[in-house]
Amino acid sequence: MKLHELKPAEGSRKVRNRVGRGIGSGNGKTAGKGHKGQNARSGGGVRLGFEGGQTPLFRRLPKRGFTNINRKEFTIVNLSTLNRFEDGTEVTPELLLETGVISKLNDGVKILASGAVEKKLTVKAHKFSSSAKEAIEAAGGSVEVI
């Protein structure tokens, strides 16, 4: 391979199609818009979701549920991620934030029992699943609900 033999990858360089520039281009005169009608006009076209007057899908489907304004969203931390801390560490939401285990606190931290914990840790969080609580205590650690 020599410098003058280099070619761009097949299909990576596409020439822009200039419409309305003469009959010989194949896209002259009507510029690919056909004859008359809403879509041939400048600024023409139908709004999003319009189905030609037929009742649109978003109106045919029923409404469902509601948004609970009191919903609490907990940041989830699994037991397997707690193994990165040294034995005897007090694991708090602030520590999890500064070590980059979680990116934001939301409404608190919930510890779930995915994986296993091998270290003796004092874990402080807003919520624990019952199996996570048992696993931490079985490993010799302690659990504290904030």
Curated annotation (Swiss-Prot):
Residue stretches of biased makeup (Basic and acidic residues)? 1-13
Give the record's keywords alphabetically.
Answer: Ribonucleoprotein, Ribosomal protein, RNA-binding, rRNA-binding
This entry carries the following GO cellular component terms, namely: cytosolic large ribosomal subunit
User: What biological-process GO terms show up in the record?
Assistant: translation
Name the segments for region: Disordered: 1-51
Keyword Ribonucleoprotein found: yes
Functional description taken from the UniProt entry: Binds to the 23S rRNA.
How the protein assembles, per its UniProt entry?
Part of the 50S ribosomal subunit.
Q: What is this protein called?
A: Large ribosomal subunit protein uL15
Species whose genome carries this gene: Bacillus cereus (strain G9842)
